[in-house]
Amino acid sequence: MEENMEEGQTQKGCFECCIKCLGGIPYASLIATILLYAGVALFCGCGHEALSGTVNILQTYFEMARTAGDTLDVFTMIDIFKYVIYGIAAAFFVYGILLMVEGFFTTGAIKDLYGDFKITTCGRCVSAWFIMLTYLFMLAWLGVTAFTSLPVYMYFNLWTICRNTTLVEGANLCLDLRQFGIVTIGEEKKICTVSENFLRMCESTELNMTFHLFIVALAGAGAAVIAMVHYLMVLSANWAYVKDACRMQKYEDIKSKEEQELHDIHSTRSKERLNAYT
């Protein structure tokens, strides 16, 4: 009988501990972090592969070659974009962890309204700092989303030309890379529907795959923007709650101080009356 009671108390204690741990998880920050990681993974992974596919398409079907020396050509720009993608993946992996840690600490400060005042003050300052940083990152991701839409538009035009040549017999359509700024005005890198390279490019799966990879990368950038907006809402709410916690703590300190002063005054008066009677 006693063993059953001890076992029940142990199970109850474990259940209460699990409930307490689950209650301390910042679910809003967790959802935003998952969305951020998913968006960054889609953008970085698909964007990297789409850039590699673009290099193959330019070299195979447009017959472009890398410029010797330190000349800044389209292939050098693509390599730079790949390094930027590596940096974005690493930076936002760390930033997501920092925001989750901030969410845990701020949630603990909010739940303990009567805790140490230094904890809530630190949480308030950290929340304000992350709000500013997240807002800047949101603007940056908006720019990345707008920039990613450019290759999607270019590949959509190319895909449309391929589709129109199959629907309209005898159509002679051309695509000049100079109109997209990929090559200089002096270079003529034009491919027309009557050429063999164009037909092979339209029949290959590489064009279709690269086009859809850029679309998924654009969707990933949009998901990162949504995650940044979600983080802004979470951080703003946490900052407001921590600010209220600070005010509550100040009020409690002033209230306890006044009560102590009143108690001291009453004690002093009681002693004076007692001395007067004696």
Swiss-Prot record:
Task of the protein: Involved in neuronal differentiation, including differentiation and migration of neuronal stem cells. Plays a role in neuronal plasticity and is involved in neurite and filopodia outgrowth, filopodia motility and probably synapse formation. GPM6A-induced filopodia formation involves mitogen-activated protein kinase (MAPK) and Src signaling pathways. May be involved in neuronal NGF-dependent Ca(2+) influx. May be involved in regulation of endocytosis and intracellular trafficking of G-protein-coupled receptors (GPCRs); enhances internalization and recycling of mu-type opioid receptor.
SMART domains to which the protein is assigned, alphabetical: PLP
Known glycosylation sites: 164, 208
Swiss-Prot/TrEMBL GO biological process terms: neural retina development; neuron migration; neuron projection development; neuron projection morphogenesis; positive regulation of filopodium assembly; regulation of synapse organization; response to bacterium; stem cell differentiation
Family matches, as PROSITE patterns: MYELIN_PLP_1, MYELIN_PLP_2
Top-level lineage group: Eukaryota
Subunit structure: Interacts with OPRM1. Interacts with palmitoyltransferase ZDHHC17/HIP14; the interaction leads to palmitoylation of GPM6A.
Family designation: Belongs to the myelin proteolipid protein family.
Transmembrane segments: 23-43, 85-105, 128-148, 214-234
Cellular compartment(s): Cell membrane; Cell projection, Axon; Cell projection, Growth cone; Cell projection, Dendritic spine
Annotated organism of origin: Homo sapiens
GO cellular component: axonal growth cone; dendritic spine; extracellular exosome; extracellular vesicle; filopodium; glutamatergic synapse; neuron projection; neuronal cell body
Molecular function via GO: calcium channel activity
Protein name: Neuronal membrane glycoprotein M6-a
UniProt modified residues of type Phosphothreonine: 278
Pfam families on file: Myelin_PLP (PF01275)
Keywords carried by this UniProt record: Acetylation, Cell membrane, Cell projection, Disulfide bond, Glycoprotein, Lipoprotein, Membrane, Neurogenesis, Palmitate, Phosphoprotein, Synapse, Transmembrane, Transmembrane helix
